[in-house]
Amino acid sequence: MVKLKVLSPNGTLFDEKIEMVIVKGAEGYAGFMRNTQPSIFAINNSVGYITYPDKTKKSVVIENATLYCNKDLIKIFALDFVIADNLSYDEIMKRKKDLESKIKDTTDTKELIRLQHALDIELLKLKEAK
């Protein structure tokens, strides 16, 4: 087992012992577990997968992150990290509609990019919501 700790600007989002985490970077998916060589890995906005000690697996949605690992600890510094089981389809659809409305009404390029990024994250969450 290895400890996975996820930190964000809003505090600690996850802090548990796991068997493995699989995340997606620019070059594809990579898995990290106990005794992995020390590494730094950039994570794209993507879906990752956690395997727990009891062999259950859960999907997670990760927003712009960097992973650091050594043999006993994996740290992920992310803007957001949400376990798919905790996602609400109705809440995501509401945020999606709000963002689409704002995008339609926005003329500022910087704001449009920010809103589009937020919409991309909501669409990723929508794929994983049950």
Swiss-Prot record:
Which cell locations does it reside in?
Answer: Cell membrane
Annotated Gene Ontology cellular component terms: plasma membrane; proton-transporting ATP synthase complex
Q: What main location does UniProt list?
A: membrane
* Domain of life (superkingdom): Bacteria
Q: Which residues form a coiled coil?
A: none
Q: Does the keyword Disulfide bond apply?
A: no
> What's the short name of a Pfam family annotated to this entry?
ATP-synt_DE_N
Q: How does it sit in the membrane?
A: Peripheral membrane protein
The protein's UniProt keywords, in alphabetical order, are: ATP synthesis, Cell membrane, CF(1), Hydrogen ion transport, Ion transport, Membrane, Transport
Q: Which Gene3D superfamilies match?
A: F0F1 ATP synthase delta/epsilon subunit, N-terminal
Which is an annotated GO molecular function term of this record?
proton-transporting ATP synthase activity, rotational mechanism
What biological function has been recorded for the protein in this entry? Produces ATP from ADP in the presence of a proton gradient across the membrane.
Q: Give the record's subunit note.
A: F-type ATPases have 2 components, CF(1) - the catalytic core - and CF(0) - the membrane proton channel. CF(1) has five subunits: alpha(3), beta(3), gamma(1), delta(1), epsilon(1). CF(0) has three main subunits: a, b and c.
Q: Which HAMAP family match?
A: ATP_synth_epsil_bac
Entry similarity comment: Belongs to the ATPase epsilon chain family.
The entry's protein name is: ATP synthase epsilon chain
